[in-house]
Amino acid sequence: MSYSSPLEITKEDIKTLSDSFYHNILSNNNITENIISFSKNGDMPKELRPTSWKIFFGIFPNNSNIIDWVEAINKLRIKYNKKKKKYLSIKKYKGDPLNIGGANNSNKKGERNFNTLYEENELRRIINLDIIRTYQNINLFSQEKIKKLLLNILFIWCKENDDVSYRQGMNDLVAILIICFYPYYFIFEEKEKPNKEDVIKYINIKEPKERYKYSNIVYNYFHDEDEIECDLFFAFDSLMKKGM
């Protein structure tokens, strides 16, 4: 099955995508070598792009099996949720941020908190200036959820790397990753979302036909749109570290 544009893939294609994932990943004992071979030969199936980037960026451990991938991505998703809670949750500061003239400890805290809030709002403003101009010729990037995804990833990364902070062009790097990842992620109903233990159980099924029956569930685990922000964040983080 061929696609004229990666952004044209719809949820109806998921059976084809999960089948490709099964034949090239789940039923293959040399996953990394298989992906590298596709890359060298220039015939990488489009539906394997997110998987290949996760290997190249080190999100998936190199020369490992798919159970190692499950463990790795699960740990990263837990880690990213903690980052979101730390940097994106509404903070309730102690001390009066407006009363900064006093010498007592409470007012000093208020001054620090006021400065932090100002700096964070300024960082968001600067990032948003680029986001509203990012690939606006592509409908995907005019969606509010994509703009929010871009903002969250860039804001959290800059908070964790304040020695670098935000630089113009970072938005374009994340946008390219979105183009590579987003078309192959889908919104699944709660009953379609397996947990880590179920996925490992299905992967360990020895009988090929029986294993194939559950391949779509394994595919779902790696391509849940609710988790794409996490996957993109660590891909971007790896890209930045390789470039820095």
How would you label these PLM feature ranges?
Residues 1-163, 174, 178-226, 233, ...:
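N-terminal transition regions in large eukaryotic proteins
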